[in-house]
């Protein structure tokens, strides 16, 4: 076949683009490589081998940048076109394991007849079995592996994997034998010492502390010389030495090694996170956070270390949301420096037998990093926030102020809680508290457990929680002696305490003001100024809306909530509807009027059919105060909708951020396909996270369930996290469904005190007190007959009516009305 000149030229250009993409990939310029591969893949009529090369290249780049789901989609596309070979399926199985899709990995690998890569198939399938709790099947599978034809390295890998699985099953003696055999089969090198480090843990599990320490010390010696102290493998071995000492009961020594590990890990995160994608950061941190916080088990050995770890690890990902790469790309010089630093660190992290060359690469990267920080305020503040210590926080505390980091540690079956207390002198205390089981199973005065009451939607159960003095004492009594009378307490919760408003259980706390924070790290930052512009939305019309403002939107409509709600058969997508909230219109009007009276804040109030999702997206970024009075929702999944289903640790942000949201005008109608050109009236947490709310000093969510969400070390993955990611400051949110009228009164009192000059946390606490003590007069009957009028007929006979008197009552004194709302300082 003879090609025309034009066709030959087009073919040549395609080949050139493929070669350029390969070159970019090899150079580590993955984003540019993906664009080049995509350009090839989008061409029509190209040979299947070219398309395979382009899609495989995209998958490789996506995998390297942590975009594992995109990489998986690339392989699925290859498979759909009939181009996926055995190697591709093995790569696909690696992605399934990385993403935690173990059942999918089993479905892919079990029927696979691999003539090549049989060792990879067996190892990956065994790993999937082990993660699914089928450890016995995993070991049986590895036992059937044909070793004929395997290289010594492949045999060693197979044996090492058997050891890893045996160790996960608690079979430490067998694991030690397998790992020892594997180590003996491997040549001197990084791989051998990774196996040796795990052998050390297996020996520790057998109770052989001296053997374990000898193995781990040999690893540390080799890694320090050949990889350097900045290499992740060295840090991992340092941590494993700490774990061995901890298991042997040598807590003081363990704390010293954990301290070294924490220093190495913090430096690694500070060096690396600015050069990682969001997904790479998430994958790294969700895997490593439990390891960083293992030191909590050393308890009172070094409380200052534990406080610094809590300060660093809580909400870490929120601290690095700033897109350093995007900022660097705005300036040519900064962009070049960014790329140079990334390249130097990649090369140094590969490890080298030439220690001087490796150290030279690290040193040059550090020098260039100092130059980049001098050029970029964002990068400088990024590093400063990551390196805060308890001493930095102590300097921000007043004489009568105390900071508390609650921590949770231990295995899932035996989790414990403790409090790390910090005062203005810099002294850190460790206070052991309770186990998670004892807290969940605490028996309230009405006979129900705390776990049952928190899962319940009944108002009586909420009242039982927040009026139980024994529960309040259990939570706070051990901390009371450490606190100054009538001082201020700043606390950052952990675990179950995210879903429990313990600041509303402080009647016995010496009259202290209690303020909730995401992390006490926030004390190092100045509060944002609420003065500026306020946005108030309420009285939302859920049946109708004015959709015209979509024409002014800067982005295409986001209708992802519609499909999610439809799939889960939740309103309004599944023949349900959100009801109008009459008190929210008056709430919005009152707050606007209060703000307008001499506060110097310009207020915009949007109500009724105009209170659309699009209107919010357009108006909110320029506002310093935002008040949203509407419906809210949060759910875990269709099988586990109760609140405590959120207390899970292994969660992916992209899933959980689509399970909470707020409802805007027209939502009952706009979710229907006929309105596909417009926003659907449901603002998900994920959508909120993509907004720019840096100016917002305060966001008030006068709505139900806005404080709920799955719990991780990063805090609550609900709507509040979406706002935090968007840059919002303080947030008012709710833990359960709230009363319409009580909420209106609470919010108006809050703004009354806040605009009157009261500090935000005090204004919020006083507003709750006002609501509890709010009095109204009602007419009630007495037992005395009223003979001033004639008799009345009742139940077939004539009787005197009862006298009526006016009585003063407090209709909102019960916690069901005021305890749901929490103020979270970012």
Residue ranges and their predicted role:
Residues 191-194, 198-459, 473, 487-508, ...:
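Alpha-helical solenoid repeat scaffolds used for protein-protein interaction
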Residues 372, 376-826:
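Catalytic cores of enzymes
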Residues 18, 22-26, 53-64, 87-98, ...:
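Conserved alpha-helical positions within TPR/SEL1-like repeat arrays
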Residues 40-42, 79-80, 113-114, 143-147, ...:
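Amphipathic alpha-helical segments of tetratricopeptide repeats
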Residues 48-49, 83, 116-119, 150-153, ...:
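Helix N-cap/loop-to-helix boundary motif
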């Amino acid at each position: 076949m003879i090609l025309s000149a034009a066709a030959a030229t087009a073919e040549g250009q395609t080949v050139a683009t493929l070669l350029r993409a390969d070159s970019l990939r090899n150079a580590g310029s993955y984003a540019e490589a993906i664009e080049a591969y995509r350009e090839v893949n989008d061409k029509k009529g190209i040979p299947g081998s070219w398309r395979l090369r382009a899609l495989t290249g995209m998958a490789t780049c996506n995998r390297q940048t942590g975009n594992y789901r995109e990489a998986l989609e690339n392989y699925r596309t290859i498979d759909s076109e009939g181009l996926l070979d055995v190697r591709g399926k093995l790569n696909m199985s690696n992605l399934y394991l990385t993403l935690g899709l173990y059942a999918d990995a089993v479905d892919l690998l079990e029927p696979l007849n691999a003539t090549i890569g049989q060792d990879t198939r067996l190892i990956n399938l065994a790993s999937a079995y082990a993660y699914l709790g089928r450890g016995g099947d995993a070991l049986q599978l590895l036992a059937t592996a044909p070793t004929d034809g395997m290289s010594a390295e492949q045999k060693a890998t197979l044996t090492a994997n058997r050891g890893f699985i045996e160790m996960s099953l608690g079979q430490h003696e067998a694991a030690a034998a397998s790992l020892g055999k594997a180590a003996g089969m491997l040549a001197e090198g990084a791989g051998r010492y990774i196996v040796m480090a795990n052998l050390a843990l297996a020996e520790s599990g057998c109770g052989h502390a001296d053997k374990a320490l000898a193995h781990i010390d040999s690893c540390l010696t080799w890694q320090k010389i050949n990889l350097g102290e900045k290499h992740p493998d060295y840090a991992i071995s340092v941590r494993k030495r700490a774990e061995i000492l901890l298991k042997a009961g040598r807590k003081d020594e363990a704390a010293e090694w954990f301290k070294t590990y924490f220093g190495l890990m913090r430096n690694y995160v500070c060096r690396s996170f600015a050069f990682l994608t969001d997904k790479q950061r998430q994958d790294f941190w969700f895997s490593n956070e439990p390891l960083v916080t293992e030191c909590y088990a050393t308890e009172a050995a070094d409380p200052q270390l534990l406080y610094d770890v809590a300060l660093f690890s809580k909400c870490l990902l929120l601290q690095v949301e700033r897109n350093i790469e995007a900022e660097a790309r705005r300036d040519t010089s900064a962009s070049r420096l960014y790329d140079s630093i990334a390249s130097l660190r990649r090369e140094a992290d590969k490890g080298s037998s030439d220690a001087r060359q490796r150290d030279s690469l690290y040193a040059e990267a550090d020098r260039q990093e100092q130059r980049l920080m001098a050029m970029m305020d964002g990068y400088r503040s990024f590093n400063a926030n990551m390196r805060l210590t308890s001493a930095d926080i102590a300097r921000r505390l007043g004489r009568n102020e105390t900071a508390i980091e609650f921590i949770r540690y231990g295995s899932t079956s035996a989790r414990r809680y403790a409090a790390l207390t910090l005062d203005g002198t810099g002294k850190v205390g460790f206070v052991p508290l309770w186990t998670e089981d004892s807290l969940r199973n605490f028996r309230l005065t009405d006979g129900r457990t705390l776990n049952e009451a928190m899962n319940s939607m009944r108002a009586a159960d909420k009242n039982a929680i927040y009026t139980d003095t024994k529960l309040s004492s259990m939570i706070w009594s051990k901390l009371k002696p450490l606190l100054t009378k009538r001082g201020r307490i700043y606390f950052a919760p952990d675990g179950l305490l995210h879903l429990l408003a313990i600041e509303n259980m402080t009647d016995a706390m010496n009259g202290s003001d209690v303020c909730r924070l995401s992390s006490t790290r926030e004390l190092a930052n100045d509060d944002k100024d609420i003065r500026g512009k306020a946005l108030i939305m309420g009285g939302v019309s859920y049946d109708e809306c004015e959709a015209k403002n979509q024409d002014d939107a800067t982005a295409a409509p986001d209708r992802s909530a519609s499909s999610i709600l439809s799939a889960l058969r939740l309103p309004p997508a599944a023949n349900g509807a959100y009801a109008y909230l009459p008190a929210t219109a008056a709430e919005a009007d009152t707050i606007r009027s209060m703000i307008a009276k001499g506060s110097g804040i310009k207020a915009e109030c949007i109500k009724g059919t105009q209170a659309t999702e699009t209107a919010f997206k357009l108006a909110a970024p320029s506002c310093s105060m935002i008040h949203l009075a509407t419906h809210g929702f949060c759910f875990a999944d269709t099988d586990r909708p109760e609140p405590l289903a959120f207390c899970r640790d292994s969660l992916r942000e992209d899933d959980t951020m689509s399970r909470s949201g707020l409802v805007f005008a027209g939502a009952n109608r706009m979710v229907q396909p006929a309105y596909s050109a417009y926003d659907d009236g449901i603002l998900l947490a994920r959508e909120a996270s993509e907004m720019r709310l840096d100016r917002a000093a305060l966001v008030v969510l006068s709505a139900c369930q806005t404080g709920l969400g799955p719990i991780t070390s990063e805090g609550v993955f609900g709507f509040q996290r979406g706002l935090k990611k968007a840059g919002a400051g303080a947030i008012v949110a709710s833990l359960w469904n709230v009363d319409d009228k009580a909420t209106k009164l609470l919010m108006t009192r809050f703004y009354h005190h806040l605009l009157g000059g009261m500090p935000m946390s005090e204004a919020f606490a006083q507003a709750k007190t006002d609501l509890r003590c709010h009095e109204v007069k009602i007419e009630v009957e007495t037992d005395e007959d009223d003979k001033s009028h004639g008799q009345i007929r009742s139940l077939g006979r004539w009787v005197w009516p009862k006298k009526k008197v006016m009585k003063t009552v407090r209709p909102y004194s019960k916690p069901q009305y005021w305890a749901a709302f929490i103020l979270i300082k970012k």
